[in-house]
Structure formats: C-alpha cells, structure tokens
Amino acid sequence: MVREEVAGSTQTLQWKCVESRVDSKRLYYGRFILSPLRKGQADTVGIALRRALLGEIEGTCITRAKFGSVPHEYSTIAGIEESVQEILLNLKEIVLRSNLYGVRDASICVKGPRYITAQDIILPPSVEIVDTAQPIANLTEPIDFCIDLQIKRDRGYQTELRKNYQDGSYPIDAESMPVRNVNYSIFSCGNGNEKHEILFLEIWTNGSLTPKEALYEASRNLIDLFLPFLHAEEEGTSFEENKNRFTPPLFTFQKRLTNLKKNKKGIPLNCIFIDQLELTSRTYNCLKRANIHTLLDLLSKTEEDLLRIDSFRMEDRKHIWDTLEKHLPIDLLKNKLSF
C-alpha cells in the first residue's frame, strides 16, 4: 500500500473507473477511484474490498477428468505426447465463463493426429470458454482419445486427496478465483479540517468477468454480509427465542477462560476463537491455514498434527502452550491437550 500527498477538492462521495484495458483474452485490468473519504475510511474500504475480491468471487472450472483405464496420474498414454499429469495441469488452466450452479458434465472426444485445445471441449449450453486456443494435449498418432470432465462453480482454492482411481478418474485442484490480483493505494488531500482521502483500486481478472463486474459482485457480497445486522432490530430478533442455541457472551479470552475455571460446564470450547488467544501473526496464520479456528479445534490436535502444518515451528508450539497453560485449568489441559 502506498500513501502520497496530492491536491484535491472535497466533493460528494463517488466512484469512477479511470482506466480499463484488455491485455489478453485471460488478463483484464481495471483501475477505480473512490473519494472523498474521511481519514481511515480508505483503509477500511480497501482492505474489505481486496479480501472480498480475492476470496468471495465465484468462478467456474474443471474439477475432475476421467481417462479410462489409467493406473496413475504419472502414466503416459500411447500416441499422446503429454503425460496424464501434464494433461491435468493443462485442464486446470482452462478459463470458463458461466452462471451455472452444481456439477455439470463435459467431454473431449477427438481422433489424432492433431493438437487438442480448449475449443475441442464439448460443454453444456450454459458454459463458454474464454480462450479457445488454450492447449490441452498433442496426439501424435491416429488414435481415438476421449476424456469425461466435470465442471463446477465455486469460490477459492479447492484441493482433493491424491489417490489412484480404478475407473481412471482424477481430481483437479480447482482454482475458482476469477480475480488474479488486487492492489489499492491511498492519497491524502487538503489541509486541516478539510483533509480527506482518495482510494485507488486496481483489479486484474482472468477474463471470465471484467474488473467492473468483479467489483460489483464483491461489493454486493459485503452488503449481504452486513444485512442481518441492519434487519436485526426490525425483525425483533431475540436471543431468548433460541433457548436451545448457545450464544457466547462478549467476553475477552481471559474472561472466558476464567469462566471455564469457575464453572464445571463453562463455555463450550468451540465458542472460543483463536483470534482471542493473542497469538503472534505468524502462529495465527499457520493455524488458520490448517482450518483451526476455535479452541476446540486446537485442543483436538496432537503435537505431530501441528508440526505437520506448513511453516509451523517448535517456537510456535511453545508459544501456544504457554498461552494455554497460563489460562486453562490443568485438568483440562491433561485431558484435552495431546502435547
């Protein structure tokens, strides 16, 4: 993030697309401006939009391929230049555009010798290919080559366990992320009480949607996220109505753990989030990447489980232990904590 002093005038809050271009079929660029914002607001909006753009925008991609009787993904098929793994990687790069929901079937069925490109994929009517020239494989001999594909619309990065499938079906680690990158910069304008901020937002997409469409969808997702809070009072929401549902009080981490010591039932461990453990950013990010979100998740892990987490170190383990040992009852540590 860059901060720079520039001249400007106060005006009604508005946004505008100041630059838009198509670098290639799979690379669109857009630059947007939002102003005037009060001091600190540009950061708030910039961070929220960046996260929503990178993590909340849905995309369509190929998630599975079935070759027939192929023993493993490192196999080679007679008459095809690429290995099965290389073909899977090429299929992973195919950019699709659609509004479908759920899983759809597609296929490739060609006869060599010839090059196979994305144009050869037989798709359902609701799906289209962004770049039909994307390569898939090269058939060097006159063979019949068929692949059954599965297509799914999702968000984020989806992975599946690698294993041999007897029917020749292999998962593809799907990148359902149409937004390739997002940058924002903040410029300060004016002097004294007239000082305000201008937010510049840069968005790169893979061509399945434009940066303007991505910005619209991200903004809509953020609005939908906060709508329940706006309607809570109108709908007369009362937590007393949900007597069977546990509602955690707004305590600090220390107060919650003190409650655990005083009350045998205490607060459910799945209602204490690791955000409240006052961990270092590095340790916190390691746990988040391993889908450890609550104290219950953490206490369910062994030392071996934690050390298998990417970039997790013994210092992180000691830091977590010191924090828990300071606040948790000893008997709970013995019963729950495996390290």
From Swiss-Prot:
<dbReference type="Pfam" id="PF03118">
    <property type="entry name" value="RNA_pol_A_CTD"/>
</dbReference>
<keyword id="KW-0548">Nucleotidyltransferase</keyword>
<protein>
    <recommendedName>
        <fullName>DNA-directed RNA polymerase subunit alpha</fullName>
        <ecNumber>2.7.7.6</ecNumber>
    </recommendedName>
</protein>
<dbReference type="Pfam" id="PF01193">
    <property type="entry name" value="RNA_pol_L"/>
</dbReference>
<feature type="region of interest" description="Alpha C-terminal domain (alpha-CTD)">
    <location>
        <begin position="264"/>
        <end position="339"/>
    </location>
</feature>
<dbReference type="GO" id="GO:0003899">
    <property type="term" value="F:DNA-directed RNA polymerase activity"/>
</dbReference>
<comment type="function">
    <text>DNA-dependent RNA polymerase catalyzes the transcription of DNA into RNA using the four ribonucleoside triphosphates as substrates.</text>
</comment>
<dbReference type="GO" id="GO:0005739">
    <property type="term" value="C:mitochondrion"/>
</dbReference>
<dbReference type="GO" id="GO:0046983">
    <property type="term" value="F:protein dimerization activity"/>
</dbReference>
<dbReference type="Pfam" id="PF01000">
    <property type="entry name" value="RNA_pol_A_bac"/>
</dbReference>
<comment type="similarity">
    <text>Belongs to the RNA polymerase alpha chain family.</text>
</comment>
<dbReference type="GO" id="GO:0009507">
    <property type="term" value="C:chloroplast"/>
</dbReference>
<dbReference type="InterPro" id="IPR011262">
    <property type="entry name" value="DNA-dir_RNA_pol_insert"/>
</dbReference>
<keyword id="KW-0150">Chloroplast</keyword>
<dbReference type="InterPro" id="IPR036643">
    <property type="entry name" value="RNApol_insert_sf"/>
</dbReference>
<dbReference type="InterPro" id="IPR036603">
    <property type="entry name" value="RBP11-like"/>
</dbReference>
<dbReference type="InterPro" id="IPR011773">
    <property type="entry name" value="DNA-dir_RpoA"/>
</dbReference>
<dbReference type="GO" id="GO:0000428">
    <property type="term" value="C:DNA-directed RNA polymerase complex"/>
</dbReference>
<dbReference type="InterPro" id="IPR011260">
    <property type="entry name" value="RNAP_asu_C"/>
</dbReference>
<keyword id="KW-0804">Transcription</keyword>
<dbReference type="GO" id="GO:0006351">
    <property type="term" value="P:DNA-templated transcription"/>
</dbReference>
<comment type="subunit">
    <text>In plastids the minimal PEP RNA polymerase catalytic core is composed of four subunits: alpha, beta, beta', and beta''. When a (nuclear-encoded) sigma factor is associated with the core the holoenzyme is formed, which can initiate transcription.</text>
</comment>
<feature type="region of interest" description="Alpha N-terminal domain (alpha-NTD)">
    <location>
        <begin position="1"/>
        <end position="233"/>
    </location>
</feature>
<keyword id="KW-0808">Transferase</keyword>
<keyword id="KW-0934">Plastid</keyword>
<dbReference type="GO" id="GO:0003677">
    <property type="term" value="F:DNA binding"/>
</dbReference>
<keyword id="KW-0240">DNA-directed RNA polymerase</keyword>
<dbReference type="InterPro" id="IPR011263">
    <property type="entry name" value="DNA-dir_RNA_pol_RpoA/D/Rpb3"/>
</dbReference>
